[in-house]
Structures are given as C-alpha cells and as structure tokens.
C-alpha cells in the first residue's frame, strides 16, 4: 500500500484550541465532505485511499474538529469486536438532544435490537454525510427513519454543544 505499519494510528489534523464552535462544526463537516468518494472499508478510518466505515469517518471528522473522545481511538476502532458507533452514542461527554432539535454537525445514529449499528453527520436540510456497510463510498444522502434493518434513534448526539 505504500503506508507504514502504523497506518492504523492515522488521525486527522485537529483545529487549535482557540477555534470557535462554528469553526469546529465546519471543520468536522469539511473533513467528512472531503472524504466523499472514498471507498468503504470495514474497520477503516482513513486516509482517503484506504477507505472508511461509518464510525471511522465520524471519528476522524471529530479529530479534525479538535475533539478526541478518549478512550475511543482509531486503534480500538480497528478491533473486530469493538463497536465504535455504539461507543460514540454512549460517550458521556457528548450531549443528547431530541431528533427534532437536530443541528448542523450533530451525529445521527441508527440501532437494531438495542445496539447502535450506524452513525452519520448531519449537514442540515435533512441531509447527512456517511458511508455504509453496503460497500458504497462515502457520500451525502437524505436522512431516513430506517437504514437497512436499523431504525433512527429518537435523539441525536451533539459533540459540540
């Protein structure tokens, strides 16, 4: 691949601590948007030519915004039994708000059987950026109440209150 064995440690370059909330939201969305067209890779967290899965794309976008949701990491993300989407949904330092109050930069989650299985970034105007398990590349889509076998959670996660 031309990448060192440490490619699993790849992290997007974050904004400085002095960045405003608006700058952070736009950095998060901008990072995800710049990955559109990147291939789907299960357990992938970039860079672009190596691909992403849904939570890897969101995790790198959070890093780009200057957020580091420890103990969730790109290393753990690659573990076969680690569920990054579920961990992001349950992360105690992110705010949960009703779906009807969603804002640009919020995270929209889907779950099946009580387990979160998919995550996307809300862009506004009922649009999201994500990649999915169906092998399609990172892209922009309309939000839907269900996604495959999973249903949207009644709340969204606001990583940048």
Question: Which residue stretches match the model-derived regions?
Answer:
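Extracytoplasmic/periplasmic, Sec-exported soluble proteins
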Residues: 20-24, 46-54, 97-100, 111-112, ...
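Intrinsically disordered, low-complexity
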Residues: 1-39, 100, 149-161
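Residues at structural and domain junctions
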Residues: 14-18, 43-44, 91, 106
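...with weaker cross-activation on analogous glycine-rich loops/strands in unrelated enzymes
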Residues: 67-144
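Secreted/periplasmic proteins that engage bacterial cell-wall peptidoglycan
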Residues: 24-91
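Residues that form or immediately flank small-molecule/cofactor binding pockets and catalytic motifs
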Residues: 45, 133, 161
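Residue-level detector of conserved, well-ordered beta-strand and adjacent loop positions
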Residues: 43, 109-111, 157
